[in-house]
Design a protein with these regions (language model features):
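Generic, well-ordered alpha-helical scaffold segments in large soluble proteins
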Residues: 33, 79, 83, 126, ...
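Catalytic-core signal marking the mid-to-C-terminal active-site face
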Residues: 1-18, 55, 66-68, 75, ...
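Acidic, glycine-rich loop-and-beta core segments that form the ion-binding/anion-interacting portion
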Residues: 198-291
Length: 433
């Protein structure tokens, strides 16, 4: 991912230096286990650890060797041998390249998941804070983009919080799904390496041993992981789209923080655009791009092929780096989001009471009018508001058929905003406990 949408904490997980360090640790831990089993000398295992641990792996040198070998793991092992010396013959005993590559990828994905979980905690904290801050800030709810009935800004934040909380649980499950390693040798049969080596290496790396690998770790695990990241990205976009609509000039119920010195347009000095949430909408697309390729990686030939490899070399870093950046950007947007309660009330009153139409409809049915006739009466008066700019309450009070069923007091009572928010505390208790 380009530096513009990257944070150093996540980039470091995918650096060549980090990758080669994990490669070395897998080889060194395997050497320790093999030494305990009497397969290689204990002094050799000690030498591998000491000399390899002190080495500063030269990425350029490894690339130079790979240019000849056309094999990245062999290039690394050749470079490692330059540090270790004669005992390097005991490195990679009974192992295959996938033991190193697949286990390393999963270590990196686990570390990435841990960072993403911390990011989500920041987003959740921001959403919760703003939810309680605006628990009773009334705004119009919209369906199909059209005024529906009153809700509160706090409930808007609360539903995003609940969605992100579900996503966090999904990511915890996806992390567990991906936290496996394999050191099972060619075609995964342990023919030339003891299963206890795999168990030891995985324990040291904080992984579970893959129950059955076929030289590679099954890619359904990775498919679930990246699918989860795609869902999280969609939830980010869900929040971003809401904010973008709320910042429209004719709505202006909320606005991204506009910092001193910020410019909105090279041509129009007056512009204050929702650029951060627009950016988040685009970044969500990039994250979701990884989902289908990850699923297509599940079907491999027989015990293995490398059709998955080129895909994962790209989507592993790009997707996690992008999502990490997006989550932190979203948290910042929510934390600094400017809310305009007065505009919310102004917008809600724009159609002069139409938002109370359902209450009038229900009152008529409860007064003995058929649902069909009740709907006709309410809609007839509502259309006068839409088409003539009339006042809904006044039209109802002047409608003889409506007044035959409902008194003035009964009609006026149906225009109480508090009626629509009376269960906000109940919903908050469900969401926040």
């Amino acid at each position: 991912m380009i530096p513009r949408y990257s944070r150093p904490e996540m980039v470091a997980i995918w650096s060549p230096e980090t990758k080669f360090r994990i490669w070395f640790e897998i080889e060194a831990y395997a050497g320790e286990a093999l030494a305990e089993l009497g397969v290689i000398p204990k002094e050799a295992a000690k030498t591998i650890w000491e000399k390899g641990d002190a080495a500063k792996f030269d990425v350029a040198r490894i690339d130079e060797i790979e240019a000849v070998t056309k094999h990245d793991v062999i290039a690394f092992l050749t470079h490692l041998a330059e540090f270790i010396g004669p005992d390097s013959r005991f490195v990679h005993q009974g192992m295959t390249s996938s033991d190193v590559l697949d286990t390393t990828l999963n270590v990196q994905l686990v570390r990435a998941a841990d960072l993403l979980l911390a990011d989500m905690d920041r987003v959740l904290a921001a959403l919760k804070k703003r939810a309680f801050e605006h628990k009773d800030t009334v705004r119009i709810g919209r369906s199909h983009g059209i005024h529906a009935e009153p809700t509160t800004m706090g409930l808007t934040f609360a539903r995003f919080y609940a969605e992100m909380e579900r996503n966090r649980a999904r990511l915890v499950a996806a992390r567990a799904e991906i936290a496996t390693g394999a050191v099972s040798g060619a075609v995964g049969t342990f023919a030339n390496i003891d299963p206890r080596v795999e168990e030891y290496v995985c324990e040291k790396l904080g992984l579970e041993a893959e129950p059955v690998s076929t030289q590679v770790i099954p890619r359904d695990r990775h498919a679930m992981f990246f699918a989860t990241l795609g869902v999280i990205a969609s939830s980010i976009e869900n929040v971003a789209i809401e904010i973008r609509h709320m910042q429209r000039t004719e709505v202006l119920e909320a606005e991204e923080f506009f910092s001193p010195g910020q410019k909105g347009s090279s041509a129009m000095p007056h512009k204050r655009n929702p650029v951060l949430t627009e950016n988040l909408t685009g970044l969500a697309r990039l994250v979701r791009m990884s989902v289908v390729p990850a699923m297509e990686n599940v079907a491999l030939w027989h015990e293995r092929d490398i059709s998955h490899s080129s895909v994962e070399r790209a989507i592993g870093p790009d997707t996690t780096i992008t999502l990490d950046f997006a989550l932190n950007r979203l948290a910042g947007v929510v934390e600094k989001l400017v809310i305009y309660p007065e505009n919310m009330l102004k917008n809600m009153n724009k159609f002069r009471g139409l938002v109370h139409s359902q209450r009038v409809l229900l009152a008529l049915t409860q007064a003995g009018v058929s649902r069909e006739d009740s709907y006709r009466l309410v809609q007839r008066n509502a259309m006068k508001v839409w088409e003539q700019g009339a006042d809904f309450l006044e039209e109802l009070l002047g409608d003889a058929e409506v007044r035959a069923a409902l008194s003035e007091e009964q009609i006026r009572e149906k225009f109480d905003l508090g009626y629509h928010t009376k269960h906000v505390d109940t919903i908050f208790k469900r969401v926040f406990g």
